[in-house]
Amino acid sequence: MSSYGSVLFLFSLLVWGTIAQEAPASAAQRCFCQVTGYLDDCTCDVETIDRFNNHGLFPKLQQLVASDYFRYYKVNLKKSCPFWEDNSHCGVRDCAVNPCSSDEVPGFKPPGFKYTEEANHVHEDVDDCEKEKRLSAVDESLSVETQEAMLKWNRHDDSSDNFCEVDDEESPDAEYVDLLKNPERFTGYKGADTWRIWNSIYEENCFKPKAVQRPLNPLTSSRGENEGNMFYNWLDGLCVEKRAFYRLISGLHASINIHLCATYLLKDTWMDKIWGHNVAEFQKRFDATLTHGEGPKRLRNLYFIYLIELRAISKVLPFFERSNFLLYTGNETKDKETKKILLDVLQDARDFPLHFDENSLFSGDKKEAAKLKEDFRQHFRNISKIMDCVGCFKCRLWGKLQTQGLGTALKILFSEKQIENLSESNQPSAFHLTRQEIVALFNAFGRISTSVQELENFRKLLEKV
């Protein structure tokens, strides 16, 4: 080729390269541009997690959490906020209840009435009232058989130290909730109240000094593009434990947002409600252009919390595979079937090839590591308390469950020696999980697993935009 031809060829490559670089990214690329490759502080990549979860673990988890043992969660949704005085609840129609008269609603009867046969067969009398219920209302009705079984379940529980604030199950305000009747989805709960909740979580409990502003924080004045640079320079300079704490909270936040976008109220009439994927809402929360580059980082943190909870589940297998451990609901046949599914899930988790190495946490000077671990635990306990400040009852339900689930995962990760010393005998051991912790752990991981699976759905939908 002549020198002139060579110059022309190189010039053509340069022009086409420039055009390619300037071509606008697609909607899918803007959301998922960083959702690939290896994760920070881990030896695992996004693609391995996608294959493992979406084509293997996800359907088994869904079957598990739909079983009787895992679908009922006892929770107190009436506790007051311990950090600020705020008696307000979600005021949007779909997030608030228009009260019925006292003779129509079981909730206004004496405390024991709601568990009677009469209380659970009032649907014909309150049809008009039911139409006024908001999306965030928690359906607390239980069948007669379930009510009777609940009385027996608690005998199999103990208590233990943990990473989150636990509701007093003996409180008259603590009630069993059927999670299948109360799915986590869009409720219309948004605005200043939600910002205040998440601001308290990030600003006061993520080891962050006041001088460093979190990007896109609506409750603080913006410092422009440099705001993000300052924050991530600070984050990169933290020890791995503090960095992990922030990424866990960010991953949980991302997961919750994905659920709301995936089961969004697309149509609402008095006759019908249609739920489905809201692509525009997903873009608003995760598109790199619309979030100044923050959205894809949040999605990467979703995979980080997935690895943490997956590692915890893999490590707790010895606790559940003991022959004397029962998933007790009173139905022996179903209980055995549920335990079989559970052990299958746990074995799959153990077989995952690229687990997070929890030994990288709290591994320095013993005295400093012990203090850092306690700070870690206290910060997380504060976050679990903040969930009592959420004004939407359905959001509060799932917030409390998911923080307890993550707290239980952390408890497992830092109880390795106690788990190794478990025995088949009925003697008390240093490690134990209550029924509430077990239900929260697997439902919380089920939510994270669902989020990872939903990303595949959103990726396909965005490719059509």
UniProtKB/Swiss-Prot annotation:
Membrane topology reported for the UniProt record: Peripheral membrane protein
Localization of this protein: Endoplasmic reticulum membrane
Glycosylation (residues): 331, 382, 421
Keyword annotations of the record: Disulfide bond, Electron transport, Endoplasmic reticulum, FAD, Flavoprotein, Glycoprotein, Membrane, Oxidoreductase, Redox-active center, Signal, Transport
EC number(s) stated in the UniProt entry for this protein: 1.8.4.-
The keyword Signal is annotated on this UniProt entry: yes
Residues engaged in binding FAD: 185, 187, 198, 250, 253, 285, 298
Enzyme class: oxidoreductase
One function term, GO molecular function aspect: protein-disulfide reductase activity
GO biological process assignments: protein folding in endoplasmic reticulum
Cystine connections: 31-44, 33-42, 81-389, 90-95, 90-129, 95-100, 206-239, 392-395
Subunit and interaction comment: Predominantly monomer. May function both as a monomer and a homodimer.
Record function comment: Oxidoreductase involved in disulfide bond formation in the endoplasmic reticulum. Efficiently reoxidizes P4HB/PDI, the enzyme catalyzing protein disulfide formation, in order to allow P4HB to sustain additional rounds of disulfide formation. Following P4HB reoxidation, passes its electrons to molecular oxygen via FAD, leading to the production of reactive oxygen species (ROS) in the cell. Required for the folding of immunoglobulins.
Stated family: Belongs to the EROs family.
Full protein name: ERO1-like protein alpha
Species in which this protein is naturally found: Xenopus laevis (African clawed frog)
